[in-house]
């Protein structure tokens, strides 16, 4: 009889173990661990069913264990010691398992060469109105348990810090230059760079934070940028780019009242030029601030904020950036900057490239233009890791977010995500180096 590993290697996605295992104190915990590990090892859905009430109890008792696991996760478990017959039902994602097997290069290397009987089973159900029992996490990059979240944040920050430590050590740089906008991404980049310099025992004054007010900069973000740099003890500089951009507009024949993409991108490229030149002057590195979600959408100016000398946030999705900043804000050593960080977290996400309102409020809000980042991160996670088709992504998002977003709105932003994801690949092909923080960032596509 084939071992279960052989069944999986031969292509079986669903492994069923019919057992007659008795119950003992502590045995169930071990059994659960064994089942979940086996499903992870074989990249399969694993069903375990053992006999229960009605069996002889001369000297042993059967609890009626029923467990369903999928790739290391316990999906459903039957009630133990029940006196009644019961049916345990769970949804398992066969497509997900098949994708994971294709991506695991070593899996196919051990495919059995001996004859194996295969019986085809159709996966499609005739029950069109089948009510799915499985739930989907709307924020797949963020652990639900507080303890796991703490561990995840600490781990990602350490990955970012050690990546930058190695880059500084390798290049021999002793200075860093960062554009500070008063937004989430540049804030996280500054926090990571400060921790890096602390670890290298370099003075924080060797970090030059530059705020570069433009046509859309608001008082709130400008104030937070200056306050954060001062409280963190880095070298602070302020260079207003408005006049330089106006001269540039005249040089290229752009009307000053033109609010086209050229108007916006010229500001981003002016800022990058300033950062690069100051880094050259000081013998330092320009630290990139763009995050994984922005890069997936191509929401960056090519050769503007898209470019740096090392992008510390390039492997961190936007929904996770907010949690990382919040985690750092809650640390005891962050007491002096906590209020500033919390205000930055509450600030609407915006590139601030178009003029603000008369009241000085942000008018250009990113999530109103390209869609909610929590939706895009949901699409990103499931599309890149599992290759789900659009119809399935739409279905899963409807299940995950419930009534928060109408079906039509989810469809609208899914179309935006897919269109931008593929059309903006040319930007990702020319990215600077940056640390891989989550396990779904290594994707190579032709442009």
Where are these regions (language model features)?
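C-terminal accessory region of radical SAM enzymes
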Residues: 89-93
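ATP/NTP-dependent adenylation/nucleotidyl-transfer catalytic domains that generate, transfer
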Residues: 40-44, 53-56, 77-78, 95-182, ...
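Conserved small/polar residues in nucleotide/adenosyl-binding loops
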Residues: 1-5, 441-447
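CN hydrolase (nitrilase-like) catalytic-core segments centered on the catalytic cysteine
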Residues: 3-88
């Amino acid at each position: 009889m084939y071992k279960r590993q052989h069944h999986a290697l031969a292509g079986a996605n669903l492994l069923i173990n019919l057992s007659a295992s008795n119950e003992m104190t502590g045995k169930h915990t071990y059994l659960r661990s064994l089942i979940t590990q086996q499903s992870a090892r074989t990249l399969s859905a694993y069903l375990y069913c053992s006999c229960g009430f009605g069996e002889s109890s001369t000297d042993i008792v059967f609890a009626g264990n029923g467990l369903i696991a999928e790739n290391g996760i316990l999906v459903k478990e039957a009630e133990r010691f029940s006196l009644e017959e019961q049916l345990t039902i769970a949804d398992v994602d066969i497509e997900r398992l098949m994708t994971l097997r294709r991506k695991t290069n070593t899996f196919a290397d051990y495919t059995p060469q001996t004859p194996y009987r295969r019986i085809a089973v159709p996966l499609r159900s005739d029950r069109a109105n089948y009510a799915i029992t499985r739930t989907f996490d709307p924020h797949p990059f963020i652990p639900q348990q507080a303890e796991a979240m703490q561990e995840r944040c600490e781990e990602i920050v350490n990955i970012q810090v050690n990546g930058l430590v190695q880059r500084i050590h390798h290049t021999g740089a002793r200075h860093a230059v960062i554009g500070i906008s008063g937004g989430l991404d540049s804030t996280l980049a500054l926090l990571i760079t400060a921790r890096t310099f602390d670890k290298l025992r370099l003075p924080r004054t060797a970090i030059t934070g530059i705020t570069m007010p433009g046509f859309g900069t608001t008082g709130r973000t400008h104030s937070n940028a200056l306050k954060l740099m001062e409280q963190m003890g880095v070298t602070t500089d302020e260079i207003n780019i408005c006049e330089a951009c106006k001269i540039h507009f005249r040089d290229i024949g752009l009307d000053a009242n033109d609010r086209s993409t050229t108007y916006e991108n010229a500001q981003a490229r002016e800022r990058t030029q300033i950062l690069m030149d100051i880094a050259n002057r000081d013998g330092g590195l320009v630290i990139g601030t763009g995050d994984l979600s922005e890069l997936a959408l191509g929401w960056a100016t090519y050769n503007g904020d898209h470019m740096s000398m090392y992008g510390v946030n390039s492997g961190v999705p936007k929904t996770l950036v907010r949690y990382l900043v919040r985690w750092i804000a809650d640390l005891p050593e962050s007491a002096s900057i906590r209020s500033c960080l919390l205000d930055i977290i509450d600030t609407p996400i915006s590139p601030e490239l178009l003029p603000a309102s008369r009241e000085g409020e942000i008018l250009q809000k990113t999530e109103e233009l390209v869609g909610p980042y929590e939706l895009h991160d949901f699409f990103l996670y499931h599309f890149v890791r599992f290759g789900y088709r659009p119809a399935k992504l739409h279905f899963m998002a409807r299940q995950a977010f419930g009534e928060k977003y109408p079906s039509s709105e989810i469809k609208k932003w899914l179309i935006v995500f897919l269109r931008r994801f593929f059309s903006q690949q040319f930007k990702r092909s020319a990215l600077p180096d940056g640390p891989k923080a989550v396990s779904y960032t290594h994707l190579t596509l032709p442009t």
